[in-house]
Swiss-Prot record:
The chain crosses the membrane at residues 4-24, 33-53, 54-74, 94-114, 159-179. Its EC number is 7.1.1.2. The keyword Transmembrane applies. GO terms for molecular function: NADH dehydrogenase (ubiquinone) activity. It comes from Yarrowia lipolytica (strain CLIB 122 / E 150) (Yeast). Complex I is composed of 37 different subunits. One of its GO terms (cellular component) is mitochondrial membrane. It is a multi-pass membrane protein. InterPro entries: NADH_UbQ/plastoQ_OxRdtase_su6, Nuo/plastoQ_OxRdtase_6_NuoJ. This is NADH-ubiquinone oxidoreductase chain 6. It is found in: Mitochondrion membrane.
């Protein structure tokens, strides 16, 4: 059963990369938005498969429910016939996307490797708070509320994923603003 989960994780990673390429190479902005929604669903499936069910639900609610609807609203305001983009202009950005993907992959591997010098230096600089995690009374259920439990899980075990989601949300906010800005020519 465990191998089947790893197999599905590999499939979701491959589908996410494929959807990203389709987003970049789509000629019509509406088709690009549909691929982006598919990418959000695939990312939510990936988060569920690695054991982060609450993050997958939050990802679907925030990104598909809010950001994608906002993008669809902005794109419906644009004149689709005049905004048809050539595939060459989108493919031109592919090296930048690949470089960004490589940098994010290397940084993720550095963070999750046990013998990373960078992470050890950061822990020394900001203080090693593993003692507070270990000394926390995790089995005292009577005094723990749901908000406290979610806060402990978000800010201790999954802080990196929370930061990545915040950066993606920031990019999702900046995107519609840059689309609707009128450039002086």
């Amino acid at each position: 059963m465990m191998y089947l989960t790893y197999y599905f994780i590999e499939i979701t990673i491959f589908l996410a990369i494929l959807c990203t390429i389709f987003i970049i190479s789509a000629k019509n902005p509406m088709v690009s938005i549909l691929y982006m929604i598919a990418l959000f669903v695939i990312a939510a499936m990936y988060l569920y498969l690695i054991g982060l069910g609450i993050f997958s639900l939050l990802y679907i609610m925030i990104y598909i429910g809010a950001i994608a609807v906002l993008f669809l609203f902005i794109i419906t305001l644009l004149d689709i016939n005049s905004t048809e983009l050539s595939v060459k202009s989108n493919i031109r950005d592919l090296p930048l996307v690949l470089i960004s993907l490589i940098v994010l992959t290397i940084s993720g591997l550095m963070i999750y490797s046990n013998d990373s010098i960078l992470i050890n230096k950061l822990l020394e600089a900001f203080g090693n708070d593993y003692n507070t995690i270990i000394t926390q009374d995790w089995f005292n259920i009577e005094n723990t509320t749901l908000l406290t439990t979610i806060g402990n899980v978000l800010l201790t075990n999954n802080a990196f994923i929370l930061l990545v989601l915040a950066i993606v949300l920031l990019l999702g906010i900046i995107g519609p603003i840059s689309i609707t800005m009128k450039h002086k020519e």
